[in-house]
């Protein structure tokens, strides 16, 4: 109920978590994974979060099949190390500065209403690291669906994805389409979809918190598959796993 609170926060030295099937709503960082290594997040619903998922100074966080409603997914890294840190030992429990990578973001569903204008996916690092950390934070970003109705009368699209490192003065670039992302980084979102759709055309009853898919979203032929151990943790069949977001495919 506190407007500036975090939801589920794994802070400092966590390893290889399997975190599935939950609903987080109305927090600043609904799921926060900080200074840690290894987590799989799947089957979550994030609603009205400043950041639905926030990954900070961590490595190997795999985010599969979650539903984001008016919520951003954010992966961040900065210069923080144990030397002269105000907590000292905290950064020493996680990956070193040059190891904060290896993330996966796949088969998620990100949907916004007309009032939401923020980017839906963010990878950010400060300018001071641009020359030293040149590899991307993620090893795979693919098969995600971004649904946002185009603003009436808008000549340009709203920001969709923030990418860093980038060859800009700020080390960050903001893109408004998946086509622009593929032009910049062809390996990203080869099977992603950007839809000009409202929440009411995607979900069974968004006004009532019913975020099951109204109709299946057709998958692309070569998009990533949900790993078997994650599918089993969710209790899904192989058919169920052909879905986007947190709710399984219902053949009926």
Predicted regions and their residues:
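C-terminal accessory segments
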Residues: 145-148, 179-252
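Glycine- and acidic/polar-rich repeat regions and solenoidal domains
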Residues: 1-207
């Amino acid at each position: 109920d506190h407007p500036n609170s975090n939801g589920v926060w794994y802070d400092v030295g966590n390893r290889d978590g399997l975190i599935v099937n939950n609903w987080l709503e109305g927090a600043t960082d609904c799921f926060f994974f900080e200074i840690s290594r290894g987590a799989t997040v799947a089957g979550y619903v994030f609603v009205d979060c400043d950041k639905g998922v926030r990954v900070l100074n961590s490595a190997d966080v795999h985010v599969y099949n979650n539903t984001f409603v008016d919520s951003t997914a954010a992966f961040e890294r900065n210069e923080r190390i144990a030397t002269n840190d105000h907590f000292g030992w905290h950064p020493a429990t996680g990956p070193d500065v040059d190891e904060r990578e290896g993330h996966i973001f796949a088969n998620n569903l990100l949907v916004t209403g007309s009032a939401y204008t923020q980017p839906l996916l963010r990878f950010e690092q400060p300018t001071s690291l641009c020359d030293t950390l040149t590899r991307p934070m993620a090893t795979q970003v693919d098969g995600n669906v971004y649904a946002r109705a185009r603003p009436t009368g808008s000549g340009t699209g709203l920001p969709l994805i923030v990418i860093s490192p980038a060859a800009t003065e700020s080390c960050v670039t903001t893109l408004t389409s998946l086509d622009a992302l593929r032009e910049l980084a062809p390996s990203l979102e080869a099977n992603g979809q950007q839809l000009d759709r409202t929440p009411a055309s995607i979900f069974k009853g968004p006004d009532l918190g019913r975020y099951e898919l109204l109709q299946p979203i057709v998958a692309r032929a070569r998009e990533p598959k949900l790993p078997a151990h994650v599918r089993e943790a969710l209790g899904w069949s192989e058919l169920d796993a052909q879905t986007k977001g947190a709710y399984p495919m219902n053949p009926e």
